Regions:
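Bacterial N-terminal signal peptides
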Residues: 7-17
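Divalent metal-coordination and catalytic microenvironments
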Residues: 201, 225, 231
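Bulky hydrophobic segments
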Residues: 21-218, 237-383
Length: 383
């Protein structure tokens, strides 16, 4: 226990150091979100573009579904560690691309300039702000890579998540119009960023651990996760098409500006309203008596992995749900013919089945369905 407390205090101290070093995002001209079910947005011109970026340093460390969550490590309760988990739309602070492990820890503890957590919205259900931010960042990252190599055959290799993650880009003739090439790059980037998020949900369920020894099964297929990722992809798509990607600081400021606007458009609840919604689904969607390390703290999951989706809504609130989607094509280009997200076998697959060659997004529904069947069986056995 003394060791765990020491680790906690060390992380806290280093997080404060990081906050002192965080750069302020540049001011941005506010951009209105385009929160319609389908989007046909296009760039007016080929805006100035930043150089190819390094990928974000992992994902932000958030959020298990629920509030006032208690933790344990190696079966030992951590009384000094608790997660409030509720945020409000107008108090989300800044946005920082390429968040470090320490930055994520600071945000999770509530001491960062960038806030993460969950809130409830009338049209989008529960929204996980960390997932919104992560997929927005990955959309920018992929855009910076794709636009620089558009039309070329090449392979982008990412860090492993159980499987070896690779994106194979195929050779093709890009549009002659520079603005159309820009738009095509954005559409493809948003598509791939969402696919990356969907794989992360699958990997978590099958045993992926970003910190060795700490199971992430409690977060796998959380009801709000992929809708939040989809929202992040759509917001980033809008911003990049509006020319907000000439630098990381410009994009970060633009995300900080557009996020509260989008959440209010979705009908964001205040802190007490979100808390009330959590309480209404306690015992149905989550178990407030369980600690974070327990998989079935989460009782309700959403195993759908497609990027055309409704939010999972509690009780009789489905009528107000807003469907969001990403484009399947642009002009005559089918996006799935331009790039393929591939998951190759490794020697550290945990519980993930070994593919004949590699998994693709076409296999995601099958892998998710297997997870759902096993969870349903386990929940029945637990009753």
């Amino acid at each position: 226990l003394k060791c765990l407390v020491t680790m906690f205090l060390a992380t806290l101290f280093l997080s404060f150091l990081l906050i002192a070093c965080q750069s302020k995002p540049a001011p941005a001209t506010p951009v209105e979100p385009m929160l319609r079910s389908e989007t046909y947005e296009q760039a007016e011109t080929d805006w100035p573009v930043l150089s190819p970026l390094d990928p974000p340093e992992g994902l932000r460390a958030c959020c298990v579904f629920g509030y006032n969550l208690k933790a344990e490590a190696l079966g030992i309760p951590m009384p000094l560690f608790g997660i409030d988990n509720i945020v409000e739309a107008e108090k989300l602070g800044e946005h920082h691309y390429n968040d470090s492990v320490l930055g994520a820890s600071a945000a999770l503890l509530g001491i960062s300039n960038e806030k993460i957590g969950l809130l409830y919205t009338e049209k989008g259900g529960f929204i996980d702000i960390a997932h919104v931010r992560d997929t927005a960042d990955y959309t920018l990252y992929f855009f910076s890579q794709i636009y620089a190599h558009l039309g070329q055959e090449w392979v982008l290799t990412l860090d492993n998540e159980l499987a070896a993650r690779k994106i194979h880009f195929f050779a093709f003739t890009p549009p002659e119009d520079p603005a159309e090439s820009y738009t095509l790059s954005v559409y493809l980037a948003a598509k791939l960023a969402f696919q990356l998020a969907a794989w992360h949900e699958i990997a978590q369920w099958y045993g992926y651990q970003s910190i060795p020894g700490f199971s992430e099964a409690v977060s796998a297929f959380s009801p709000e996760d992929l809708y939040s990722n989809l929202l992040g992809a759509r917001l980033a798509l809008t911003l990049i098409l509006q020319g907000q990607a000439s630098s990381v600081s410009q994009f970060s400021a633009a995300i900080a500006n557009i996020l509260p606007i989008a959440l209010h458009e979705l009908g964001a609840y205040d802190r007490s309203g979100t808390k009330e919604m959590f309480d209404q689904v306690d015992g149905i969607w989550w178990n407030s008596y369980q600690r974070i390390s327990k998989k079935f703290l989460l009782l309700r999951r959403n195993y759908e992995t497609q990027d055309d989706r409704y939010p999972l809504m509690p009780f009789d609130k489905e009528k107000s749900a807003l469907r969001l989607s990403l484009p399947e094509s642009y002009q005559h280009f089918s996006l799935d013919k331009l790039a393929e997200f591939q998951l190759w076998p490794t020697d550290k697959m945990k519980n993930l089945p070994v593919p004949q060659r590699y998994w693709t997004v076409k296999d995601f529904p099958m892998l998710a369905e297997k997870a759902e069947k096993q969870d349903m069986k386990q929940l029945l056995n637990n009753k």
